[in-house]
Amino acid sequence: MADDLDFETGDAGASATFPMQCSALRKNGFVVLKGRPCKIVEMSTSKTGKHGHAKVHLVGIDIFTGKKYEDICPSTHNMDVPNIKRCDFQLIGIQDGFLSLLQDSGEVREDLRLPEGELGREIEQKYDCGEEIITIHGARFTTS
């Protein structure tokens, strides 16, 4: 579903990321690993050794592709954290390959195409069974 959405929009002057000290990151939070916005699924810290700072080992899953990334950084260094926006919509219909989604504001959004493949079939099946909530994660994020 992420392939069909526009994640390049945001408020004027909004930054794609903000810095956070590595030691302040937490599991289930977000971080940029290898240039990709990831959700942190594993995190461990090594003790300070005689040759430097404590190190933090991070394992994250790309929020758009599901690919796994890892990185190790000193606990005192800053890492980029992506600005993530989470939106819940009520799925009120599927017509001609597009989703009809009710926003919190009461407006209906009908510009999102039903994803192809397994994800699209799963959404249709859940809708047919009465599930109506769709969560969309968006990030104002660009790769260079």
Swiss-Prot record:
Q: Does the keyword Cell membrane apply?
A: no
One GO BP annotation is: positive regulation of translational termination
Provide any one GO MF term from the record.
translation elongation factor activity
**Protein name according to UniProt:** Eukaryotic translation initiation factor 5A-1
Q: Which topology term describes how it sits in the membrane?
A: Peripheral membrane protein
Gene, per the UniProt record: EIF5A1
Which purpose does this protein serve, as stated in its record?
Answer: Translation factor that promotes translation elongation and termination, particularly upon ribosome stalling at specific amino acid sequence contexts. Binds between the exit (E) and peptidyl (P) site of the ribosome and promotes rescue of stalled ribosome: specifically required for efficient translation of polyproline-containing peptides as well as other motifs that stall the ribosome. Acts as a ribosome quality control (RQC) cofactor by joining the RQC complex to facilitate peptidyl transfer during CAT tailing step.
Do you know which SMART domains this protein is assigned to? eIF-5a (SM01376)
Q: Where in the cell is it found?
A: Cytoplasm; Nucleus; Endoplasmic reticulum membrane
Q: Which UniProt keywords apply?
A: Acetylation, Cytoplasm, Elongation factor, Endoplasmic reticulum, Hypusine, Membrane, Nucleus, Protein biosynthesis, RNA-binding
Gene Ontology terms: cellular component: endoplasmic reticulum membrane; nucleus
Question: InterPro entries, from UniProt?
Answer: IF5A-like, IF5A-like_N, NA-bd_OB-fold, Rib_uL2_dom2, Trans_elong_IF5A_hypusine_site, Transl_elong_IF5A_C, Translation_prot_SH3-like_sf
Subunit structure, per the record? Binds to 80S ribosomes. Actively translating ribosomes show mutually exclusive binding of eIF5a (EIF5A or EIF5A2) and EEF2/eEF2. Interacts with DAPL1; interaction takes place at the polypeptide exit tunnel of hibernating ribosomes and prevents translation.
In the record, which positions carry Hypusine? 50
Post-translational modification, briefly?
Lys-50 undergoes hypusination, a unique post-translational modification that consists in the addition of a butylamino group from spermidine to lysine side chain, leading to the formation of the unusual amino acid hypusine. eIF-5As are the only known proteins to undergo this modification, which is essential for their function. The N-terminus is blocked.
